Amino acid sequence: MFVLAHLSDPHLAPLPRPRIAELASKRLSGYLNWLRKRRAIHRSDVLATIVRDLAQARANHIAVTGDLVNIALPAEFENARRWLEALGPPADVSLVPGNHDAYVAAADAARERLWAPYMAGDATSPPPRLREERAFQQPEDFEPQARGQGPSPGAQESTPTSPRKRGEVLGPSMAKGEFDSQRAEEEAAAFPYLRIRGPVALIGVSTAVPTPPFMATGRLGGPQIARMAALLAGTAAQFRVVLIHHPPHVVPRSRLERLVDAAAFREAVAAAGAELVIHGHDHLRSLAWIDGPRGHVPMIGVPSASAAFSTDHDAAGYNIYRIAGHPGNWTCEVVRRGLGADGAVTECERFAV
């Protein structure tokens, strides 16, 4: 049996105190939102509790589906790197970025420099990437380096997602310097990556692109979708797990938060097949299904890993996937664990997909 752990959207706290010059962009609205609301939701102590509980699962591998940071300050990427190292070495942790990890175009360089080993394909089966995987030692503990402010990052409402029709993207034009289409295409060209771990093929895709203020849409792009389809087709003998940040099956409460080319993603999976798609972004426990070439493919979301307990949103949690079987006869048991009102992490649900 192969055990895969999945957490997402840790929105690491505390948020470093930004310099004035760093707020001359979309970061300003994000920082105000943090001060107003999100710092009361995302808490470092909650995240530490979740990670300690996850360690007891003795997973073979850990998948993290994005949004490690909040407003993409340079210091946030340093903190996130240290948190990743505490979670596990690059060979044991697979990461895909989220929209907060691409909050502004200037974040690309820091994300690539500091997180690349966790987003790199196997050296023996390299995807179309320009980076090499490097090994790092895991520190004993993680303490965020904050230049100022303290508490937490954000979650959202607790209604399970359900499939809806995809619409067109309509939004304000980008401020100068906020979006560089060539740079976005170069970033997308580094994905997908492929990692083979036992019977499992982990395929990581990126939906992270800079967007205007008050937008949180994601985009894969046609070339990345085509490369993903090729990797899916080439790993049909494995249990194929696609890691993605934005849920590719719904419009999540707002058209300004969705994956704009979700339909193209679903078409690729319908043609090439996959055994499981896992995502974050909505901060919700969710399960939906899309068509595959031989039956339905489960798409499973998790809440923010740092969300404090509340009746207003899904509290922090993570999933365990227990994978067994062989091609044509795979089994996957899902175990959902989450934070309770008493601050303890317990099993919430168990089911097969």
Where do the model's predicted regions map?
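N-terminal active-site segment of His-dependent metallophosphoesterases
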Residues: M1-N79, E85
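Active-site neighborhood of phospho(di)ester-bond hydrolases with catalytic His/Asp-centered motifs
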Residues: H6-S8, H61-G66, V93-N99, S206, ...
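Active-site environment of divalent metal-dependent phosphoester hydrolases
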Residues: H11-L15, N70-L73, N99-A107, P210-F214, ...
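Extended active-site neighborhood of metal-dependent phosphoesterases/phosphodiesterases
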Residues: N79-P127, D141, E178-R227, E267-A268, ...
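Intrinsic disorder/low-complexity segments
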Residues: A123-E186
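Short acidic, glycine-rich surface-loop motifs adjacent to enzyme active sites
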Residues: T235-V251
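Conserved beta-sheet core of the metallophosphoesterase superfamily
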Residues: S254-P327
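A short C-terminal boundary segment appended to hydrolase-like catalytic domains
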Residues: I323-V353
